[in-house]
A protein has these predicted regions:
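Conserved active-site segments centered on acidic
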Residues: 2-92
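Alpha-helix C-terminal capping/helix-to-coil transition sites in glycosyltransferase folds
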Residues: 98-100
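A secondary-structure boundary/capping signal
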Residues: 27, 107-108
Length: 163
């Protein structure tokens, strides 16, 4: 994993009171790991009160038709009432969107080629939960959650330093 890096922030919109930090979560199909990462990131953003400061985007280079069943199943078991991904829809992500991110986390499967000096691209090198047994899929889920939490620790510290 890459070490913490300070990033240039996007200028705030007229309605914003804080600078915006943008995180991207990407994999090929956007049907497993990146969906879990996005869900955990949305939860972490709300828990830390960073809704106005952190934007989250996700997508795949070749999106699937739907979120993998095993991912929907194991995310429904997450502590605190579960996270419902049953209506999640994988989507394609453009290079333009990724260039607007401060950090892009790829899940270890991406064919992403992002040539941008101002984007911190991190390859989390996670196994694919699709086709995995439930225990393996849960371990992958837990690793995704840990990495998202650690990323938000960095983001929160970075935002505090620039405030």
């Amino acid at each position: 994993m890459t070490t913490n890096t300070t990033h240039d922030r996007q200028e705030p919109n007229e309605d914003d009171t804080e600078p915006t930090y943008t995180l991207g979560f990407v994999c090929v199909q956007n049907a497993g790991r990146s969906q879990m990462a996005t869900a955990f990131a949305e939860r972490e953003r709300a828990k830390r009160g960073l809704e106005d400061a952190v934007e989250i985007t996700t997508g795949g280079t070749h999106p699937a038709e739907s979120v993998h069943d095993i991912v929907v199943e194991i995310m429904a078991e997450v502590d605190g009432g579960g996270i419902d991904l049953s209506d999640g829809t994988p989507r394609e992500i453009s290079t333009e969107v990724l260039h607007a991110c401060d950090v892009v986390a790829t899940m270890g499967c991406s064919t992403l080629e992002l040539d941008a000096d101002d984007v911190d691209v991190r390859d989390w090198a996670l196994d694919d939960p699709d086709g995995a047994d439930p225990e393996t899929a849960k371990r992958i889920r837990d690793t995704v959650e840990e990495r998202v939490t650690a990323l938000f620790d960095e983001v929160e510290a970075d935002l505090s330093e620039s405030a």
